[in-house]
């Protein structure tokens, strides 16, 4: 128990190295010590085991049921008036002529009856299915690897540049890596700039951002908008300047507003659950299906979960919104005058201001 070397009896060592035999008196000393230290060991050692020829359900739980079919007793024991076991008691082992059952002192209270009862089955218990030697095992379908080692991978200096195990677990959200949405750093910078310009705290900014989202649902988020935006405080209209909202938006204001796409979609759906509501973006495009109202705002961000019908409707509305728009890379230059130096020299004998003398030929009017 403490990790020490195994104990070897002195008699065994003497017999091993000296070749001397072992006397019965020496063995008796060990036997007496066993009887003193481990009394239960000797009682279990002296137990007699009887085997019955009945059927036993080894999988059933409990030990209070019948052990199985009782084989008929033969010999003197059967003629001596042996009684069958009572219902619920352990089955008695078969006896033959000349054999005696162990008494209580010899068995120490755990004799053959207890041993047989411990392996008995509960009456009415469910039997385990026997194993048939002719049955076959379950055939499993082989599973292919998600990424095979045989596929051609990009290599640099003879080594793969991709980590296949990482790719199997790398499943980012499409919106988080999309280049049509402002990064989190850009959004944080835009938020802090508006918070500083409006001189508001975080709790007040949540109300202002909610009002700005609803205003953009109705009026769009074109980078060309200017002036002010409004939100309602009950029946009172509150006006906020648009300049800090547009100027601090990077890369564009629409890419900033893409962060509000899911919230705006849920807001429109909520409004439609209480009243008939279509955003102004959908009214301008004459969208008649109110089930598509949740997609009728210009900063809606399409993803893999967007239905095909909703994608088509949103694309048609976007095409109608941008039709006829002409974005010029360069405007009219303010310096419209032409500065060109005239190096021509004219004399009085020239035909005209733009024509020199042609060998005395005079121009008549």
UniProtKB/Swiss-Prot annotation:
Residues 68-98 have a biased composition (Low complexity). GO terms for cellular component: viral capsid. Residues 56-136, 334-365 are annotated as: Disordered. InterPro entries: Poty_coat. The keyword Nucleotidyltransferase applies. Residues 105-123 have a biased composition (Gly residues). The record marks 52-53 as: Cleavage. GO terms for molecular function: RNA-directed RNA polymerase activity. Its EC number is 2.7.7.48. It is an enzyme of class 2 (transferase). Pfam families: Poty_coat. Keywords: Capsid protein, Nucleotidyltransferase, RNA-directed RNA polymerase, Transferase, Virion. Belongs to the potyviridae genome polyprotein family. This is Genome polyprotein. It comes from Sugarcane mosaic virus (strain SC).
């Amino acid at each position: 128990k403490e990790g020490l070397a195994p104990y070897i009896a002195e008699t065994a060592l003497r017999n091993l190295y000296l070749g001397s035999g072992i006397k019965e008196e020496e063995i008796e000393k060990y036997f007496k010590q066993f009887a003193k230290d481990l009394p239960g060991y000797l009682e279990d050692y002296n137990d007699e085991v009887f085997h019955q020829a009945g059927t036993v359900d080894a999988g059933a739980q409990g030990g209070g049921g019948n052990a199985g079919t009782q084989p008929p007793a033969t010999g003197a024991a059967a003629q001596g008036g042996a009684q069958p076991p009572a219902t619920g008691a352990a089955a008695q082992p078969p006896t033959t002529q000349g054999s005696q059952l162990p008494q209580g002192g010899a068995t120490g209270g755990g004799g053959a009856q207890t041993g047989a009862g411990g392996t008995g089955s509960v009456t009415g218990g469910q039997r385990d299915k026997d194993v048939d030697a002719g049955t076959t095992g379950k055939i499993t379908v082989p599973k292919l690897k998600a990424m095979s080692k045989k596929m051609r991978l990009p290599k640099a200096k003879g080594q793969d540049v991709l980590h296949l195990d990482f790719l199997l677990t790398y499943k980012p959200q499409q919106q988080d890596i999309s280049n049509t949405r402002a990064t989190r750093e850009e959004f944080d910078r835009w938020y802090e700039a508006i918070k500083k310009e409006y001189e508001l705290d975080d709790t007040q900014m949540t109300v202002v951002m909610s009002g700005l989202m609803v205003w953009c649902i109705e009026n769009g988020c074109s980078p060309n908008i200017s002036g002010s935006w409004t939100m309602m405080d009950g029946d009172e209209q509150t006006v906020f300047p648009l300049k800090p909202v547009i100027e601090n938006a990077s890369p564009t204001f629409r890419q900033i507003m893409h962060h509000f796409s899911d919230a705006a979609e849920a807001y429109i759906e909520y409004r439609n659950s209480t009243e008939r509501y279509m955003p102004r973006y959908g009214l301008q495009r004459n969208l008649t299906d109110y089930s598509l109202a949740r997609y009728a705002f210009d900063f809606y961000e399409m993803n893999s979960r967007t239905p095909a019908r909703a994608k088509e409707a949103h694309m048609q509305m976007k095409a109608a919104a941008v039709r006829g728009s002409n974005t010029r890379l360069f405007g009219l230059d303010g310096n419209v005058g032409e500065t060109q130096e005239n190096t021509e020299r004219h004399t009085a004998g020239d035909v005209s201001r733009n024509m020199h003398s042609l060998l005395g030929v005079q121009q008549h009017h």
